[in-house]
Amino acid sequence: MSGVNEIRSMFLDYFRKNGHEIVSSSPLVPRNDPTLMFTNAGMVQFKNVFTGLEQRPYSTAATAQKCVRAGGKHNDLDNVGYTARHHTFFEMLGNFSFGDYFKERAIELAWNLITKEYGLDAKRLLVTVYHTDDEAFGLWKKIAGLSDDRIIRIATSDNFWAMGDTGPCGPCSEIFYDHGDHIWGGPPGSAEEDGDRFIEIWNLVFMQYEQITKEERVDLPRPSIDTGMGLERVAAVLQGQHDNYDIDLFRALIAASEEATGVKAEGDRRASHRVIADHLRSSAFLIADGVLPSNEGRGYVLRRIMRRAMRHAQLLGARDPLMWKLLPALVGQMGRAYPELVRAEALISETLKLEETRFRKTLERGLNLLAEASADLSEGDQFNGETAFKLYDTYGFPLDLTQDALRAKGIGVDTDAFTAAMQRQKAEARANWAGSGEAATETIWFELRDKHGATDFLGYDTESAEGVILAIVKDGAVVESAAKGENVQLVLNQTPFYGESGGQVGDTGVITTETGKLTVTDTQKRGEGLFVHYCTVEEGSVKTGEAAALTVDHARRARLRANHSATHLLHEALREVLGTHVAQKGSLVAPERLRFDVSHPKPMTAEELKIVEEMANEIIVQNTPVVTRLMSVDDAIAEGAMALFGEKYGDEVRVVSMGQGLRGSKAGKPYSVELCGGTHVSATGDIGLVRVVSESAVGAGVRRVEALTGEAARAYLGEQDERVKTLAAALKVQPADVLGRVEALLDERRKLERELTEAKKKLALAGDGQNGSGDAARDIGGVRFLGRVVSGVEPKDLKSLADDGKKSLGSGVVAFVGVSGDGKASAVVAVTDDLTSKVSAVDLVRVASAALGGKGGGGRPDMAQAGGPDGGRAAEAIEAVAGALAG
């Protein structure tokens, strides 16, 4: 029996021997394809090769591609754990031909692998072909020797693949494995085809046509091959299993969750272990590829997956975060094939632990509310969709968790009502937004773009230029001219002014004509390539068609260039120090400062920030040229350029490289390489200096770094130096000795605070004359009772005071009430261990709380705490406890 890792290796080795380039799995976040949330098939990374937009140095390839299907139309989330073959994460084995071999060789390679290399019984295999594909039908007979009844013609779209409404397409041929007549189900195309007897293990797509229009289809000049075989499915067949969750990989993960929870994967607990095993895989791989839990987009899908697993961990009785404890088992199983798991293990572990800790309160609250709302429902009933939406909207409880929690009771959810409630909320939000004219104005820019074309940007090479005024916009309408004092927007045929984008704010400066002068206060990009200059007419007037001289504020642009280049250096330094999971989540490049948001699950240490800053300044000191090049996005990514994956890039992109790497894989190579349309310094030395001034959280899994460069950084350091000198003078020490003096003062303060606390405790235990129950312990029904109203003791110190009281009694009950400055009271009751079977501290403290005007109280039988608003009744509270003790 072959293990999953061996099956994967055999597949890749087989195709390597047969002349295929073995290509590594692409990330789960598709590169340069905003139409996909996640990579969901092996052909995704070759999409542009198939369409002819990209050339590769090989014509045949094979991959083991990691895939996720948990969003959009490919959403298996609800079924995962409850069926034999649904997964959120899976591996797709595939071989590809880009105009090289076609049907005959593809069928031959597939048949030889599964029958000769994997050793599957040919008698258990049958295939399907598209109903008009006589060529494939004949080839299966010729190569595999299959009889006509084991080559099934299918007329549906199941056996015809298309990339979209237009583009490459072609017939498919699927290979099925027969698990035997002891399992219900019929062959594909039969009335019983939805049964589990015949399972598809491999799909061969023959791309031989191009769809031109809905009615027109032509032959491709170079037909291609795209195949996909689910690793988990073929492993189940090879290991003699009918259920994917019974293969060796899943057995190892489930064994880890059994050990961690102490609950066997049996009966109604079986599905929970399966959910956890599957969701651990998708969560870990998504985090390794730079996705972090959030409330939108890919991050929200990840959060839903993680929270569903965490809910099933709770069903298994886990009271502490569980998934991070299972991570070593996953890394042990898959880390060799996917080294990114090993590289990101610390990040994955930290993210899993943090998310589960945060979610526990939401889960508990949501489950309680769900239980209340569904108490009167029976099997077959529908849970109210509006209530489900309230759980989601108000309490952060996702719909799929509601569905999953109710599934065990046989209760469905009215998803139509849920969707209607969500749409209604969105409509109300739109109606409540009064707006300020921006939406109406936006249409003008598209109209001007269509009329005049895109603005030519000259600002990479110059900060001054000549142009022609094409349009003047005032108050949302196009006008012919503008006079002194008017605020307008100008569109010109070309400009050196940078329009705000990529985090860099727009340029300011001056525009002059023969008849007037304008101050440019901002520049924005509008209407797909239109640069809009926001201006005030300072002198004379201006009109459409006039020639104009445009001059950018040079000093301000210089600061912007330095700050933008510094963000690139900081980005790379952060990735070096924290890990390759760090990705840009937002930025602000302003003239006076820079701000950079990155994906990272926890606060950075002072040491990490120090190293990041030192690395960036190291590159600045090199004073090497900053190089910009234009190239295709695929060439840029092949060179290691960082991009905002998922963004749509044009055929040509601008790549900015700076610095010389000094260590590791960067040694001898450019330090930072990014796709960027912003303006940058000519050499790294022009940045002058970078100083990180703060690091903070802006959301779950996102940290913000703020920094200064050049003169602003030097001014900041000067101010800090002055503060240290002022502090040193106040402390009467040299600046170098400030830290030591402050530490000594803090130690002295802590010592005095401890002494003060101990003195207060002794005073309280000795009696301070403020209680109405006497200073000494009393005997109540054979139990020694010490009750006091204490002053000057913080509520947080009452418990330790009560512990001291118990020790002084040896055996008995202690009750203390402290009153704060605002008149509120805190009460604590402690019972020695020998009496807890007779007397409960929880019961007694509730009596005290009631006397103080409070409600409840809680704790353990030996120690409980409560409070109340009426500190004036503190002595009564002590006597109330004494009375309750007397019975």
Curated annotation (Swiss-Prot):
Its cofactor is Zn(2+). It catalyses: tRNA(Ala) + L-alanine + ATP = L-alanyl-tRNA(Ala) + AMP + diphosphate. Keywords: Aminoacyl-tRNA synthetase, ATP-binding, Cytoplasm, Ligase, Metal-binding, Nucleotide-binding, Protein biosynthesis, RNA-binding, tRNA-binding, Zinc. It holds the Pfam family tRNA_SAD. Zn(2+) binds at residues 564, 568, 676, 680. Gene3D superfamilies: 2.40.30.130, 3.10.310.40, 3.30.54.20, 6.10.250.550, Bira Bifunctional Protein, Domain 2, Threonyl-trna Synthetase, Chain A, domain 2. Binds 1 zinc ion per subunit. SMART domains: tRNA_SAD. GO terms for cellular component: cytosol. Its EC number is 6.1.1.7. GO terms for biological process: alanyl-tRNA aminoacylation; negative regulation of DNA-templated transcription. It is an enzyme of class 6 (ligase). It is found in: Cytoplasm. Belongs to the class-II aminoacyl-tRNA synthetase family. Consists of three domains; the N-terminal catalytic domain, the editing domain and the C-terminal C-Ala domain. The editing domain removes incorrectly charged amino acids, while the C-Ala domain, along with tRNA(Ala), serves as a bridge to cooperatively bring together the editing and aminoacylation centers thus stimulating deacylation of misacylated tRNAs. Catalyzes the attachment of alanine to tRNA(Ala) in a two-step reaction: alanine is first activated by ATP to form Ala-AMP and then transferred to the acceptor end of tRNA(Ala). Also edits incorrectly charged Ser-tRNA(Ala) and Gly-tRNA(Ala) via its editing domain. This is Alanine--tRNA ligase. It comes from Rhizobium meliloti (strain 1021).
